[in-house]
Amino acid sequence: MAQGRNDEPVQQALRALSGQHPGWGFWKLHHRLRKNGLVINHKRTLRIYRALALNLPRRLKKRVPARVKQPLAVPATANSCWSLDFTSDVLTDGRRFRTLNVLDDYNRELLGVEIDFSLPASRVVQTLTRLVDYYGCPAQLRTDNGPEFISARLSEWCEQQGITLHWIQPGKPTQNAYIERFNGSFRRELLDAHLFRSLAHVRQLVEEWRHDYNTQRPHQALNFMTPIEFKQAA
């Protein structure tokens, strides 16, 4: 291909996106590339798309086992179930960072927030190991079907710890409602309320907010007690 050298970044991005999202068609891939600033003209995307034979029918590989619907029960004790999820935001210099939020469903206590530019499965396991050392081992973890959560690394760690790893059904965020509701508050009250200069700045403000959330903020679902008060009253 005469334009191969100039097209290489687009080729790499198309291969990666197509591998991550095998059900995506041309237009969804094109708009993702355009959003990322790699292409503007759809004709260029289409030419590369066809050259890579991505327009040919493919057998979709089943990535995850079937998920079983599980009612969102109210735990009777602490460490019955922890919910995990990611959020993200940007620093003032435009770099995007992620947060891994870990919540105890029993008293809605925010056990920890891991923050970095990248949080692969290995960091998820490191974070959980640290939290287990401090809080004890949960009976179950509830997550969505993100790549970090369906990784063999996390599954093996949970098996070693005797923890049941429960994935919600795809497209059913209400099955992880505790952390979903928390994420809404976390974004409104913290992420959207501040301009972050650095990861150190994010970590400082998040830890201050976490302490206030756990010790000062009353929760209607907890009879207007704070998470710590609710756990101490049990």
Features from the language model and the residues they span:
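Charged DNA-binding/catalytic regions of mobile-element recombinases
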Residues: M1-A234
